[in-house]
Amino acid sequence: MKEYLAIVTAEHAYLRAEAENENGENLSGIEDEIFSGWAVKVLEKLPGKQYLKIETHYGYSGYVKEEEIKPITEDELEKRQDKDRFFRLGISEADLLDAPKVQGLPLELLLKSCIVELLEKEVVPGWSKVRRGAGREGFIHTVNLRERKEDDGYLSEKNTEGKGYFHAMRQRLAVEEETFRERI
């Protein structure tokens, strides 16, 4: 299997230490939690398993259910780096509503740190139209959108060094190790 890029489409997904056992259960530890709209790289699909081995945009690896992600292209990953278009949700949770008003019907729940695409800012004062990782569109309070501080460049096929996330970040910052450690 060739590695490929994907984004999380589930509300959130648990990054597991291992794939499921022969009974289809995953009793392994939870290594991390990843959220809707986050980019990942699929590293391996084990025959007959529902879990894929992935690597996150910050260098963690583990297993997630195949149904919790969808493939994207390198071009789509590149477009997602536009910080005027892709934002992180900055509140613990928010309803994605069908209309730009408090009385709108909830379509889905968005969790803190999920990545959404801004489709239209301030459609009415205080409300913006967004699209979440699975593709559903709706409205949220504009004040809940936060600038992404990170990017997904580590997952790019252009990053072929294979020396790990922190090495790649250090190279991008082009600083001495001591300075780099202080920054992270």
Mark where each language-model region is.
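Catalytic cores of peptidoglycan-degrading enzymes
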Residues: 169-184
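Internal, well-ordered alpha/beta segment that forms a basic, Gly-enriched binding/recognition surface
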Residues: 113
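A eukaryote-biased sequence property
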Residues: 91-94
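Boundary regions of SH3-family modules and the immediately adjacent low-complexity/disordered segments
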Residues: 1-14, 19-48, 55-88, 99-109, ...
